[in-house]
Curated annotation (Swiss-Prot):
Regulates transcriptional attenuation of the pyrimidine nucleotide (pyr) operon by binding in a uridine-dependent manner to specific sites on pyr mRNA. This disrupts an antiterminator hairpin in the RNA and favors formation of a downstream transcription terminator, leading to a reduced expression of downstream genes. GO terms for biological process: DNA-templated transcription termination. The keyword RNA-binding applies. This is Bifunctional protein PyrR. It catalyses: UMP + diphosphate = 5-phospho-alpha-D-ribose 1-diphosphate + uracil. GO terms for molecular function: RNA binding; uracil phosphoribosyltransferase activity. InterPro entries: PRibTrfase_dom, PRTase-like, PyrR, PyrR_bifunctional. Signal peptide: none annotated. A motif (PRPP-binding) lies at residues 93-105. Its EC number is 2.4.2.9. Homodimer and homohexamer; in equilibrium. The gene is pyrR. Keywords: Glycosyltransferase, RNA-binding, Transcription, Transcription regulation, Transcription termination, Transferase. It comes from the Bacteria.
């Protein structure tokens, strides 16, 4: 198994900052925006975007944590640990995740969102888009496009969970 670091901590920080600037540029009314991180690493990325938005615009946007497990199509989980402290009805919700791959995680996240309310708009921000979609889903904000083969894996590490920030590509062959 071969592992290669393709994004270091500095590059990851820059990608998150770029996503934050794009959110500012594309959303005229930031006061109507809610950030929704997909557990687990998407939540920490959402918090970082929230912090950058505060630094750049002086805004404290609400943030939620989406648990997609009860909404997945390949497993059955009863407990839903979603934390959404704000009513998302009529809001512009930005889903945030670490990697966009087949699109199934995002589909489950959207199912979770609409179970909570009726957002005015839903957009998607991801740190890494690796391709290989199985569903017609695309990201509105992308930190890095990293094409992979179907056997390779993208591993995102964040300091809050893994002790360091980096993105690696793993080839199991």
């Amino acid at each position: 198994m071969k592992t290669k670091e393709i994004v270091d901590d500095v590059t990851m920080k820059r990608a998150i900052t770029r996503i934050t600037y794009e959110i500012i540029e594309r959303n005229k009314q930031l006061d109507n925006v809610v950030l929704a991180g997909i557990k687990t690493r998407g939540v920490f990325l959402a918090r970082r975007i929230q912090e950058r938005l505060h630094q750049l615009e002086g805004l404290d946007l609400p943030i939620g944590e989406l648990d997609i497990k009860p909404f997945r199509d390949d497993m059955r989980v009863e407990e839903d640990t979603t934390l959404m402290s704000v009513d998302i009805t009529g809001k512009d919700v930005i889903l945030i995740d670490d990697v966009l791959y087949t699109g199934r995680t995002i589909r489950a996240a959207i199912d979770n969102l609409v179970s909570l309310g009726r957002p005015a708009r839903v957009s998607l921000a991801v740190l890494v888009d690796r391709g290989h979609r199985e569903l017609p889903i695309r990201a509105d904000y992308v930190g890095k496009n990293i094409p992979t083969s179907s056997v390779e894996e993208i591993v995102v590490e964040v300091v809050e969970v893994d002790g360091r920030d980096r993105v690696s590509i793993v080839d199991p062959t």
